[in-house]
């Protein structure tokens, strides 16, 4: 188990994503840039997948890129927000990250961009990824780390959690090891996004559906005095160019399913599985 465990209000996550369905693509430059970085990593991995699942597909940007990259594969985007999936044009499914609707050892590649931080149980989500991956299949993902929005977090300084909690890279790596993924690799980078004002930052987060959904978040409206104090504190971060920085700590990870030959037929050949056979029936 990870040293730190966060309780995520899944209903709050779904509500925020539902509200962001119409605005997500308008402000999704950072998620798209990170998706592009993650997709580039596939250039260095030899993989000819028959089945690809994009977990946390949102409006389908990465799903479309995966379809173009792997034209012979079945590519499915999955998310738990019905509303946000309606904005997508690719093949999409509604499903929970903690109970992936796919059969055991049926998926060659699980791709996930900036989604795992919204899982109600990250360890269970990774366990589900391990379950559905074919032996030797690839899990490739990005998420965000605890330094994300550190300027906003420190500007409140009132003892309450105003920023969604994020797992440390090492905790995620430990989970992958404990779940017996093969050759897990983790790395991180920090991106700085600049804003003219804090209200603009808050607006962008809301339009992305990226709001604090921790169970121990302070519920109810914030007082005017508290809000003004936070704005004053954040002003201390303003840079010489006049911009306010917002840090995004991006965590990248990949690992492989446990090796075995059980997914090949008697002739040692890969078997193509129809999509209706891949989906798990309860």
From Swiss-Prot:
Task: Give the Enzyme Commission number.
Answer: 2.1.1.197
Pathway it belongs to? Cofactor biosynthesis; biotin biosynthesis
Name its GO BP terms in alphabetical order: biotin biosynthetic process; methylation
- Catalytic reaction annotation: malonyl-[ACP] + S-adenosyl-L-methionine = malonyl-[ACP] methyl ester + S-adenosyl-L-homocysteine
Against Gene3D superfamilies, the record matches this protein to: Vaccinia Virus protein VP39 (3.40.50.150)
Instruction: Keywords in alphabetical order, please.
Output: Biotin biosynthesis, Methyltransferase, S-adenosyl-L-methionine, Transferase
Disulfide-linked positions: none
Q: Which InterPro entries does this one have?
A: BioC (IPR011814), Malonyl-ACP_OMT (IPR050602), Methyltransf_11 (IPR013216), SAM-dependent_MTases_sf (IPR029063)
**Example GO molecular function:** carboxyl-O-methyltransferase activity
HAMAP family membership: BioC
The UniProt family comment states:
Belongs to the methyltransferase superfamily.
Q: What does this protein do?
A: Converts the free carboxyl group of a malonyl-thioester to its methyl ester by transfer of a methyl group from S-adenosyl-L-methionine (SAM). It allows to synthesize pimeloyl-ACP via the fatty acid synthetic pathway.
Its recorded name reads: Malonyl-[acyl-carrier protein] O-methyltransferase 1
Species annotation: Coxiella burnetii (strain RSA 493 / Nine Mile phase I)
| The gene coding this protein | bioC1
């Amino acid at each position: 188990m990870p040293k730190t465990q966060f309780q995520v209000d899944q209903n709050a996550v779904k509500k925020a994503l539902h509200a962001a369905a119409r605005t997500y693509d308008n402000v999704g430059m950072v998620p798209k840039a990170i998706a592009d970085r993650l997709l580039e990593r596939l250039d260095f991995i030899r993989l000819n997948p028959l089945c690809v699942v994009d977990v946390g597909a949102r409006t389908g940007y990465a799903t479309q890129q995966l379809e173009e990259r792997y034209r012979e594969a079945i590519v499915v985007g999955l998310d738990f927000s019905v509303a946000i999936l309606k904005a997508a044009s690719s093949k999409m499914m509604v499903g929970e990250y903690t109970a992936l609707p796919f059969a055991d050892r049926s998926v060659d590649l699980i791709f996930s961009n900036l989604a795992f931080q919204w899982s109600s149980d990250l360890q269970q989500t990774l366990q589900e990824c391990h379950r559905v991956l074919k032996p030797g299949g690839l899990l490739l993902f990005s998420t965000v780390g605890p330094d994300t929005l550190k300027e906003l977090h420190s500007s409140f300084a009132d003892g309450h959690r105003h920023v969604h909690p994020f797992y440390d890279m090492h905790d995620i790596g430990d989970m992958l090891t404990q779940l017996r993924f093969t050759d897990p690799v983790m790395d991180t980078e920090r991106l700085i996004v600049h804003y003219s004002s804090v209200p603009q930052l808050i607006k962008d987060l809301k339009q992305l559906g990226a709001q604090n959904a921790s169970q121990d978040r302070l519920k109810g409206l914030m007082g005017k005095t508290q809000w003004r104090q936070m704005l004053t504190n954040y002003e201390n971060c303003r840079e010489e160019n006049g911009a306010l920085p917002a840090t995004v700590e991006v965590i990248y990870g990949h690992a492989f399913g446990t090796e075995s030959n059980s997914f090949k037929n008697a002739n040692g050949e890969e078997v193509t599985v129809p999509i209706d056979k891949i989906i798990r029936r309860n």
